[in-house]
Every structure is written in C-alpha cells, then in structure tokens.
Regions:
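Long, low-complexity segments enriched in small/aliphatic residues
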Residues: 210-285
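Non-catalytic alpha/beta scaffold blocks inside enzyme catalytic domains
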Residues: 1-226, 280-285
C-alpha cells in the first residue's frame, strides 16, 4: 500500500532515491548505494535543491536491526534536519506502532523480556524462537510457529473477525470493522484477556469493547483522534559511529511475511513461483 502511494507521487513528478539493495519498485529511482558507507557519504553533501521542495525520508527495519541501529537512525535524523525533511519509520509488524504507543516495550528488547522467564504469554508473536524451559501460553489465530511451541493455546480471532483499533506506520489511529465471525471456539482477543483476568482473581475493569476503548483513550488520548496523525515532538538521536556493511532487506519472502499469509495455499504457490523465477535463467533472444 505504501509503495503504491510512493509510485503515485513518482507519477506526479517526485524524485525517489534509495540506499539499500537494488530491487524492482515498479518505478524509476536513483540508487544511491547499498549501505552505511553510502549513508555517511550522503551526510557530507549539500542539499540546496532539496530545501525548496517538500521531502520525506523513510527508514526501514533492515537499516535499524543491526547493533548500530540507533546510530543509523541518528544519521538519518541528522540528514532530515539538513534537508528539512519529514521522517517515517517503516515497521515490519502491523501492531508495533500501537504497542509502542501503549508503552509495551522492554529495555533490551524481546530477548531481555523472555530470557529466564518461567512463563511466557505469547500474544501472536510467531517470528521468534522461545528457548526450552518456559511454559508458553499462546494466544493467536493461525497456528503458526508460536502455536507449535506452546503448552496452552487460546484461539483468538484474526483482524478481520473482530472490531479493532489499529495504528499505522505513521502513527494514525484507524478503526477496523469486523468482516466475519471467528470459527470454532475462537473468541475476540480482548474478551480472552478479560475472561482470563477474572479466572486469576484480577478482573479487568471493563465488560464491553466500548468500556475497554474508553479506558484506552484515557491512557493514550491520541487514540481518540481517528484518521489523524498526532504531532510528535522531534527528539534527535545522537548519530554515533556507524558499522560497516550493506543494509540488506528485512523481509526475504514477501508472500510469506506473516502468519495469515503462511497459512494460505495461494500465497505458498506465489512464493514458490517467485523463487522459481529468481533461479531460472532467462534465454537470450
């Protein structure tokens, strides 16, 4: 969806530049390099032409996942300041921005959160390995890797089977309406957590989705600003020493990038076809 928006801007005359692996974006762009050295070189240039036009810099997860991720982000923010550009961080998980708004983060990341834990309550996280030893409770919809590691599975609705409030990659809250009902014994995810809290003797203070949303908006007021991008304070990250090497790509198989896609026969076929095209040599005309 985002790439379609970028293509639309390109069709209207926007100039696109890319630092990273050269890929087919379906539109023309200037390939400005592959990695950290090219970003460092870009910081030394002058940007007189860019100052006269509105511009946006998008930084993806492949650039931020290394040990120098904070330094890379700092360098990009410095570049934004020099060019008077806006900044957008492109996330690879649909729920990540909303969870960060809620404060669901751990110093040291996921590894710090699960290391040494006796019990892990996994809310649909499938792109990670949980070490043996912990008792795992998995709440999710499609029986992916997280469910295979679980000791207890609580089947939840997928995003099309329940009303939801999502925050997109730019921080814009969006309402999603249920398109169908969850199969079998699967329940809406908020209802699972509410029922579990009662069983544990720590009943959560809401009995309906409306009450839950009221509590949510009280804690995070901008969640009430549906379809609006909140104004964020610019807090620069110090551009530390960058490492070496190229950025690469964050998603190696587009068609199998999430649990719902991996449960799809059609997506598996598309993935296989894409791999076949990549490995089959083209005949010379």
């Amino acid at each position: 969806v985002l790439n379609a928006r970028i293509r639309k801007a390109w069709s209207r005359g926007a100039n696109i530049g890319l630092i990273g692996e050269a890929v087919d974006l379906t539109y023309e762009y200037t390939h400005m390099g592959n990695g950290r050295a090219d970003l460092q070189s870009l910081l030394k240039q002058k940007f007189t032409d860019m100052l006269t036009l509105p511009s946006l810099m998008i930084v993806g997860q492949a650039a931020l996942q290394g040990e120098d991720g904070a330094s890379v982000l700092g360098a990009v923010m410095e570049l934004c300041t020099k060019t008077e550009s806006k900044l957008l961080v492109l996330h690879s998980a649909a729920s990540r921005v909303g969870l960060m708004d809620l404060g669901c983060t751990t110093e040291g990341g996921v590894d710090a959160a699960v290391t040494g834990a006796d019990v892990v309550y996994n809310l649909g996280v499938d792109e990670m390995d949980i070490a043996p030893g912990a008792f795992v409770i998995y709440q999710g919809s499609h029986g992916d890797r997280g469910a295979h590691r679980a000791d207890v599975i609580l089947p939840g609705a997928t995003y099309t089977e329940e009303n939801g409030l999502f925050v997109n990659t730019e921080g814009r809250p969006q309402l999603a309406q249920r398109a169908g009902f969850a199969p079998g014994q699967a329940k809406e995810n908020w209802a699972i957590l509410r029922a579990l809290s009662a069983e544990l003797g720590a009943t959560l203070p809401y009995d309906s989705l409306a009450q839950l949303r009221q509590a949510l908006v009280t804690d995070v007021p901008h969640f009430a600003q549906i379809d609006q991008v909140p104004s964020n304070e610019w807090v620069a990250v110090t551009a530390g020493k960058l490492g070496k090497g190229d950025f690469g790509v964050a998603i190696s198989d587009y068609y199998l990038s999430n649990p719902i896609a991996r449960a799809s026969t059609l997506m598996a076929e598309l993935s296989a076809n894409a791999k076949a095209r990549a490995t089959t040599p083209m005949a010379a005309e």
